[in-house]
Design a protein with these regions (language model features):
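Substrate-binding/charge-relay-adjacent region of secreted/lumenal peptidase catalytic domains
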Residues: 1-35, 42-43, 47-322
Length: 325
């Protein structure tokens, strides 16, 4: 289905206009943001108006670790006015906090791996300086061809101003003996320089790794979406759902324990994933490196137990774990 066909099937212009008129009557300014499409409204008003409308209080929060840049203004809870209840599923920038994180284990945690199986030992011959190469992955997964159709587009998603270095991608390609390929387009935050990446490895580790390997295994047009938003649902609605020609495969390596994700955030993302599925888009999500227990159990065995991870738990994505060899 095309975007217009899905919009005709799912949009609710009556509800959208009702919310639009109500916000204006309360004194809010409606922002003409075309990226929101027929599903969302963006508005600006003094914080006192939002506190009164949603029966809440906003505060400035910063992470206790000090690693987060700046603070965010959020509330602990909010209530949608009864008059809007039938038309509003969630309100962004209220209770959504930056829980999302990379689903990969730190490098040091991989160094104490158990003894390899016989199959893994055979695959070890395809290692290069003890690093996993695209050639090894091709062998392990039975991939016979890495070239793809130019219309089979793919994309990497990144959060929290994570970056990548185009020069680092070229270095990787040269190191493993692949032809040089470039990212077709960067939307949002990124790229950066090698110097910035070297100064802070965490700044580029996710973006560099994700791009290097997806481009190596599937040589098709590749896009990089970098967002500073804390909301996965907000990003996917604005940048992907509203695109007339979104990437055909979207890879997401970020996630959070589902208990920390608001119901509105979850439902909005799920609706967007369903919308994109109708349009032939596949969303691939990392289920993490920690099995069912989530990262909380890495250093605290008492926290072992089943902990669903979002967005991997969404029924309209393909959750991907590891393969043991």
């Amino acid at each position: 289905m095309t975007k217009d066909e899905v919009d005709d099937l799912t949009a609710n212009p009556t509800a959208l206009q009702f919310v639009h008129d109500h916000l204006k009557s309360m004194g809010a300014t409606i922002l003409p943001d075309q990226s929101l499409g027929p599903y969302n409204i963006k508005a600006r008003a003094p914080i006192a108006l939002w506190e009164s409308m949603f029966n809440t209080e906003f505060y400035a929060y910063s992470h206790v670790s000090g690693h987060s840049s700046g603070s965010v203004v959020r509330a602990e809870k909010y209530s949608v006015p009864t008059i809007l209840d039938a038309h509003v599923s969630s309100v962004f920038n209220t209770i959504q906090t930056p829980h999302m994180k990379s689903q990969k284990l730190p490098l040091a945690n991989h160094l104490n791996a158990p003894k390899a199986s016989s199959k893994a030992q055979k695959l070890a011959s395809l290692l290069l300086d003890n690093l996993t190469t695209p050639q090894l992955l091709n062998n392990a997964y039975g991939i016979s061809e890495n070239s793809g159709h130019p219309k089979a587009t793919q994309a990497i998603f990144s959060m929290y101003e994570q970056l990548y270095s185009a020069d680092d991608i070229v270095t990787f390609q040269n190191f493993v003996g692949l032809p040089q390929e470039k990212v077709n387009q960067t939307i949002g935050v990124g790229p950066t320089t090698v110097a910035v990446c070297n100064a802070d490895n965490d700044k580029c580790a996710e973006g560099n790794a994700d791009l290097s390997y997806i481009m190596a295994l599937s040589n098709t047009p590749t896009y990089y979406y970098g967002t500073s938003s804390f909301s996965l649902a907000e990003w996917i609605q604005a940048d992907i759902v509203q695109s007339s020609d979104p990437p055909k495969v979207i890879s997401i390596s970020y996630g959070a324990d589902e208990i920390y994700v608001s119901q509105g955030e979850y439902e909005d993302f799920k609706t967007s994933a369903l919308n994109l599925g109708l349009r032939g888009v596949t969303i691939v999500v990392s289920s993490g490196d920690d099995g069912v227990s989530s990262p909380q159990a890495r250093n605290t065995p008492a926290k072992c137990g089943y902990m669903p991870g979002f967005p991997a738990s969404c029924p309209f994505v393909t959750a991907v774990g590891a393969t043991q060899v």
